[in-house]
Amino acid sequence: MMSNSNEHFQFTDERFADLQMLRYRLNGFEDLTLSQQIYIYCLAKATLMGRDITFDQQGKYNLRIRKTLEAIYKHYDGDRTSDDFKALEVYLKRVWFSSGIYHHYGCEKFKPGFSEHFFYEAVSMMPETELPLKRGETKEDLLDELVPVIFDEEILPKRVNQTDGVDLVATSACNFYEGVTQNEVERFYARLKDGEDLTPPSYGLKSKLMKRNGEIVEMTWKEEGMYGTAIKEITSWLLKAQKYAENEQQAHVIDLLIKYYRTGDLSDFDRYSIAWVKQQEGMVDFINGFIEVYGDPLGLKGTWEGLVEFKDMKATRRTQAISQNAQWFEDHSPVAPQFKKAEVKGVTAHVICAAMLGGDEYPASAIGINLPNANWIRETHGSKSVTIGNLTEAYNKAAHGNGFLDEFAIDQETLDLINRYGDVTDDLHTDLHECLGHGSGQLLPGVDPDALKAYGNTIEEARADLFGLYYVADHKLVELGLTPDDEAYKAQYYSYLMNGLLTQAIRIKEGDKIEEAHMRNRALIANWVLEHYSQAVQLVKKDGKTYVQITDYPALRHAFADLLAEIQRIKSEGDFDTARILVEKYAVNLNPELHHEILERYKKLNLAPYKGFINPWMKLEFDEEGNVTKVLLDYTESYEHQMLRYSDEYGTL
């Protein structure tokens, strides 16, 4: 699959552990101009150069462990068919996938399937030049450091801990803090905040906070600071990309991003974000930087990510119909008037084609993104929203006929409903969530955007999901030609509640709680509705199996309206106590018997609960004078080859 041909495209690839690897297709790439293709190529390089940053942010031992495992994988000349070696291979593939030794979704530390003895032996066999040894360090020193981290379940067991009532900083292994307590972190940033500032920077977004000689200091991520060697490579490729920018505004956005990478000044990030929102022309866009804060238990620190994209003009008509009516949706939402935006500004939405994934967007990626995250920028300048159409296409193609819905949907009528409308309403819910949900509502004057602390991410995701659920059933969508009829929404309601009440639990080990913000949000909504609207939705047993039964679809819309109004109030007022009660009551715990049943039913389907993507390999074709004549897309690279190549070509730290 070297060419851009779409015939016989293989969406599914290898499978290991709980992961299924997929491929995504760059539909329409061949229709772009050569200049646009080279622009994408350079931006893709900048996207891949940040890979080591993400590894290091997700745990301070991740890079040394990855490099050691890669050395064994490449140079081990013992029995490569042994159980130990095969287990090391799977472990390494999981480390590549998760950018570290923690599960990308549940955040728990991986348990190695190989023995400590085997690891000692394998490292001892390696040439010293192949191992990540510091100056003066021996193999024994390396083993003394890494063995407890890999094998001792008590040491750094969780990347992001959300357990109520404990020190979230001290009990999380992510590499954003060192030697400080949660209380010290919260006090440090509270002192920086000025309650009167209407345009506050995102304090803490771009630094590691640590204690040195008893004093708390911020280590800023910038060219001449922490991660400087990686950031210099990123800015170098951004400069190369700038020569091929489609217009002056794109070139200006790159200027501002490079300046931010050089200064590390958060006000430079705000200037870049505002310019990025306003940059609407042209086919190509990208995200590159320390953006989302889900990887920090306190929701302050940005994990590095990269995405290069180009517009899907045909599908974008759908999102533009939504964004052009943003004021109507805001005015008619069921939340109290004082929490609504009087004037919705600058909401733009596109369906895009991902061209390259990097950092925290790779291999597992979001399918919808709405940025920037700063509330005041969204209120004053608007936001950009994207739905990633070619990733959704890959998921849908891979899921077709896999037996999942047949097992968990209650009856043939419901199955037919989902098969008929599911893909359409799923895409629409993503559009509404990203484009309008995150962009809706407002904080009351003086409310700290971080007031909900560790519960902020879950409440924000619930708010956006509820906005989408409320409006996917609105006749306005039929009028806009977005849904075929007034029945279509039922497919989304059933799928959503089935997921929130039953099937998302397949991603959680027996005995564990729900940790991840998006999963917590779905559980919160589904469990709250089940309790408060039992006349509309129930869990019922049929032939010994539990199913979701919906008896009143219109009533569910009222349920989503009620909860949306309350969640928006919590966000607008910064009501931490109610946020805590809602999340802890509805979003954290699983019914052990029901969880066991769901896992057993899922096991029989022989499916992988998590999916991620292998990137296309972009290659340049030159003429005799050395000019680029074409950007070729190679869809045949194996997962293992790609990961080893990335470590080689994009190893910056």
Predicted regions and their residues:
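Long, well-structured alpha-helical subdomains associated
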Residues: 25, 54, 469-570
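Contiguous, non-catalytic segments that form substrate-binding/exosite surfaces or channel walls
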Residues: 98, 104-416, 422
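Short, glycine/acidic-rich hinge or "gate" loops at secondary-structure transitions
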Residues: 248-254, 269, 447-450, 477-495, ...
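Short alpha-helix carrying the canonical HExxH Zn2+-binding catalytic motif
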Residues: 423-436
